[in-house]
Every structure is written in structure tokens, then in C-alpha cells.
Amino acid sequence: MSPRALVIKVTVGQEDAERCSQGFTVAATAAAAGAEVTLWLTGDATWFGTPGKAEGFRLEHAAALSELRDQVLELGKIKVCTQCAKRRGITQEDLLPGIEISGASSFVAEILTDNTQSLVY
């Protein structure tokens, strides 16, 4: 039996730092535990797929967002919402290597797969 898949969507950025950090923390922890993790960055979280943005994120008593992002990228997948990227002028070339732009149909296909749990932060 393959490991259970976990799809996490983070919809906020620095404006709701605690919720944002929780999403990244759960994604990195699940990936380290062996789950098949896909982290979706939507809304203002989209910026964290670009170089330098996660490095500037600060939240007291929380792991560095850039380290959590890198762990998820190493052990799982990170996708950025197509519409969210377009609204912010972000192209595939602007994203870190390994992060891809993908649309709602891809997100829905992932969360409707058997043995998959989805969480939204």
C-alpha cells in the first residue's frame, strides 16, 4: 500500500503569519513522516514560491519558512495557483526550480484521488 497523500493549500502570506506558518509546518512534517505531500500556494502565499520572499518571513517561535519550503520541495511537490500567479505578474521563470504553476482542475484532481486528505490554511 502506498503512503497516504496529503494536499495542503496555503491561502495567506505574512498578513496572517501564524496560519501561513502552520500550513508550511504541517506540510514539512508530513513529508518528513513519509506522506506524499503537495503544497499549493495560493493568494498571497504565491509569493513564497519566488526567490527571497520566504527568507523575509518572520514569526516568533516558528521554524524558518524558507527551510520548511525547501524541505517540502525536497520530499514532495509545491504548486502555485495559475490565476494567483497571473494576478501578481509571476511567471514560471520567476519561481524557484521545482515549483510549478498549475490550475484548479489539477488541484481538484489531486484532492479527489483515493486515499488523499486535503487541508486548507
Region locations from a protein language model:
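Residues at the starts of beta-strands that form the adenosine-phosphate
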Residues: 5, 36-38, 77
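Short, glycine-rich nucleotide/cofactor-binding loops
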Residues: 7-21, 52-53
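Short, conserved beta-strand edge motifs with alternating hydrophobic and charged residues
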Residues: 8-9, 38-42
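Histidine-anchored nucleotide/phosphate-binding helix
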Residues: 20-35, 39
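N-terminal beta-loop-helix "entrance" segment that forms/cooperates
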Residues: 45-59
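A glycine-rich helix N-cap at a beta->alpha junction
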Residues: 55-85
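A short aromatic-anchored loop/beta-hairpin motif
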Residues: 79, 88, 92-95, 101-109
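Aromatic- and Gly/Pro-rich donor/ligand-binding loops
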Residues: 119-121
